[in-house]
Protein backbone atom coordinates (compact mmCIF):
# COMPACT_ATOMS: atom_id res chain seq x y z
CA UNK A 1 0.00 0.00 0.00
CA UNK A 2 1.14 3.55 -0.70
CA UNK A 3 0.28 6.73 1.16
CA UNK A 4 0.27 10.33 0.03
CA UNK A 5 0.70 12.71 2.95
CA UNK A 6 0.26 16.47 2.61
CA UNK A 7 1.28 18.79 5.44
CA UNK A 8 -0.18 22.29 5.07
CA UNK A 9 1.58 25.13 6.90
CA UNK A 10 -0.06 26.59 9.97
CA UNK A 11 0.37 30.07 8.47
CA UNK A 12 -1.99 29.29 5.56
CA UNK A 13 -5.53 30.65 5.36
CA UNK A 14 -7.92 28.00 6.78
CA UNK A 15 -10.53 28.56 4.08
CA UNK A 16 -7.92 28.17 1.35
CA UNK A 17 -6.65 24.96 2.94
CA UNK A 18 -10.20 23.58 3.18
CA UNK A 19 -10.75 24.30 -0.51
CA UNK A 20 -7.43 22.68 -1.45
CA UNK A 21 -8.16 19.60 0.65
CA UNK A 22 -11.56 19.22 -1.03
CA UNK A 23 -9.97 19.65 -4.47
CA UNK A 24 -7.21 17.15 -3.80
CA UNK A 25 -9.63 14.58 -2.37
CA UNK A 26 -11.97 14.99 -5.33
CA UNK A 27 -9.11 14.59 -7.79
CA UNK A 28 -7.71 11.51 -6.06
CA UNK A 29 -11.14 9.86 -5.92
CA UNK A 30 -11.78 10.55 -9.60
CA UNK A 31 -8.41 9.57 -11.04
CA UNK A 32 -7.36 6.48 -9.15
CA UNK A 33 -8.76 3.76 -6.99
CA UNK A 34 -7.84 5.55 -3.83
CA UNK A 35 -8.71 3.96 -0.55
CA UNK A 36 -9.74 6.11 2.40
CA UNK A 37 -8.79 9.76 2.25
CA UNK A 38 -8.56 11.43 5.64
CA UNK A 39 -7.74 14.85 7.01
CA UNK A 40 -6.88 16.24 10.39
CA UNK A 41 -9.61 18.07 12.27
CA UNK A 42 -8.99 20.54 15.03
CA UNK A 43 -5.57 21.47 16.30
CA UNK A 44 -2.63 19.16 15.72
CA UNK A 45 -1.28 17.61 18.91
CA UNK A 46 1.93 15.98 20.08
CA UNK A 47 5.61 16.94 20.02
CA UNK A 48 5.62 17.69 16.29
CA UNK A 49 2.79 20.19 16.72
CA UNK A 50 4.83 22.24 19.18
CA UNK A 51 7.16 23.36 16.38
CA UNK A 52 4.13 24.96 14.80
CA UNK A 53 5.08 24.20 11.19
CA UNK A 54 2.03 22.19 10.09
CA UNK A 55 -1.55 23.19 10.70
CA UNK A 56 -3.44 20.56 8.70
CA UNK A 57 -2.70 17.08 7.36
CA UNK A 58 -4.26 15.15 4.49
CA UNK A 59 -3.64 11.42 3.93
CA UNK A 60 -4.70 9.30 0.98
CA UNK A 61 -4.01 5.58 0.61
CA UNK A 62 -3.55 3.71 -2.66
CA UNK A 63 -3.35 -0.04 -3.26
CA UNK A 64 -0.51 0.17 -5.75
CA UNK A 65 2.25 2.53 -6.77
CA UNK A 66 0.59 2.75 -10.18
CA UNK A 67 -2.65 4.00 -8.59
CA UNK A 68 -0.73 6.58 -6.54
CA UNK A 69 1.22 7.82 -9.56
CA UNK A 70 -1.98 8.01 -11.62
CA UNK A 71 -3.51 10.24 -8.94
CA UNK A 72 -0.42 12.42 -8.58
CA UNK A 73 -0.07 12.93 -12.34
CA UNK A 74 -3.78 13.45 -13.06
CA UNK A 75 -4.49 16.66 -14.93
CA UNK A 76 -7.08 17.85 -12.41
CA UNK A 77 -4.54 17.44 -9.57
CA UNK A 78 -1.95 19.77 -11.11
CA UNK A 79 -3.65 23.06 -10.15
CA UNK A 80 -4.36 22.05 -6.52
CA UNK A 81 -0.82 20.66 -6.33
CA UNK A 82 0.72 23.93 -7.56
CA UNK A 83 -1.43 25.97 -5.16
CA UNK A 84 -0.58 23.60 -2.29
CA UNK A 85 3.15 23.85 -3.00
CA UNK A 86 2.90 27.66 -3.31
CA UNK A 87 1.68 27.74 0.30
CA UNK A 88 4.89 26.00 1.37
CA UNK A 89 3.16 22.67 1.97
CA UNK A 90 5.07 19.42 1.95
CA UNK A 91 3.84 16.45 -0.10
CA UNK A 92 5.15 12.95 0.60
CA UNK A 93 4.53 9.62 -1.13
CA UNK A 94 5.72 6.46 0.57
CA UNK A 95 5.06 2.75 0.85
CA UNK A 96 3.47 1.51 4.08
CA UNK A 97 3.05 -1.89 5.65
CA UNK A 98 1.15 -3.12 8.66
CA UNK A 99 3.17 -4.19 11.67
PLM features: what roles do these ranges have?
Residues 65-93:
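C-terminal structural segments of small proteins and small subunits
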Residues 1-70, 94-99:
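Short S/T/G/P-rich N-terminal loop/turn motif that feeds into the first structured element of a domain
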Amino acid sequence: MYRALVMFPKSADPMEVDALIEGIASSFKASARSQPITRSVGSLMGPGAKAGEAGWILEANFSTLEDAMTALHAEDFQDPKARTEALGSTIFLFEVQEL
